[in-house]
Amino acid sequence: LTPMKIRILGCGGSFGSPLAWEKNGNIDINNPKNFRTRSSILIKINHQNLLIDTSPDLRIQLYQAKCTKIDAVLFTHQHSDHTAGLPDMRSMSLINKSIIPAYIPKEINESMINNYKFIFQGVKDYDPFMKAHILEDSFKIDDTEIKTFKHNHGSIDVQTYRINNFAYSTDLKNFYKNDIDKLKNLDLWIVGLLRYDPHPSHAGFEQILDYINYLKPKKTLFTHMTALLDYKELLSNCPQNVEPAYDGMEIQI
């Protein structure tokens, strides 16, 4: 299998961590691994940089990653903590003189284009800098094969992405039918864990551990974590080969 490097650009929930006001949940603010920007990852494979989601913190995330080129963006869903950084792709387009492809789930394709017309269609004096592609269950970006399917996130659906033996499932409440079996034989699974207790649109810690016990990936990382989850405490509660991610973490597969 083609080697890849995955960078955790951000692993926080929609508020980020710590919070923007006095109460910081349960985290130790002296531990830098508790400082989490909104969730997004960068995948380096086949000399390409693939981005999953464009968080509101994308500009600083890409700066810290020293990333000056994005070859494609894959979207999981339309919530603003996963899309609001989309305008930051303009600088990438200008630097590389390229139109950046965006792979968007069919049910949100039209609304994404309408919300960001200046990006996908252009406006007076400004050319479009991204091209929308409707997401398919299986597709290729050059030599990289990508598979995707929907999982439940409360009132909406979210895309799980799988590339070789790596998969990314943010904002997960539960899987449909037998779709979980599409995640067997993984070297790495990055999965959302908002908090310990179940949430109306997010699975709780015990349910995620049940999924991990069933799938048995070689390694699991938690993402999309609120300030209710302290890095050190959560790590102490994790079984072997399971741990919280942190911003800037890099994993080679």
Q: Locations of the language-model features?
A:
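Active-site metal-binding motif and surrounding structural segment of the metallo-beta-lactamase
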Residues: 47-104, 186-188
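Structured loop/turn residues at beta-strand edges in well-structured enzyme cores
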Residues: 68, 128, 144, 184, ...
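Residue-level signal for inorganic ion chemistry
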Residues: 6, 112, 220
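Active-site neighborhood of phospho(di)ester-bond hydrolases with catalytic His/Asp-centered motifs
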Residues: 51-55, 71-81, 104-105, 166-172, ...
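Binuclear metal-ion centers of metallo-dependent hydrolases, dominated by the metallo-beta-lactamase
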Residues: 176-253
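Core dinuclear metal-dependent hydrolase active-site scaffold
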Residues: 2-65, 131-178, 247-253
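Active-site neighborhood of divalent metal-dependent phosphoester bond hydrolases
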Residues: 96-100, 108-132
